């Protein structure tokens, strides 16, 4: 009768289909979130750069569009 719990514990320890640890899943989520944030920052920087160029061209052509 005492062998049954020991056998069950050994089966659980030797299970080849053990789920990923919580720490590994958290690390993967953080890496994925970091890449998403990096993409957003690059896109915002790119768009603001385009707006600055467009604003400077507009100010050279017509001073009424400048924010001075």
UniProtKB/Swiss-Prot annotation:
Residues 1-19 form the signal peptide. The keyword rRNA-binding does not apply. Its main location: secreted. Keywords: Disulfide bond, Secreted, Signal, Toxin. One of its GO terms (cellular component) is extracellular region. InterPro entries: T-conotoxin. It is found in: Secreted. Residues 20-54 form a propeptide. Expressed by the venom duct. One of its GO terms (molecular function) is toxin activity. Contains 2 disulfide bonds that can be either 'C1-C3, C2-C4' or 'C1-C4, C2-C3', since these disulfide connectivities have been observed for conotoxins with cysteine framework V (for examples, see AC P0DQQ7 and AC P81755). Belongs to the conotoxin T superfamily. The cysteine framework is V (CC-CC). This is Conotoxin Lt5.2. It comes from Conus litteratus (Lettered cone). The lineage of its organism: Eukaryota, Metazoa, Spiralia, Lophotrochozoa, Mollusca.
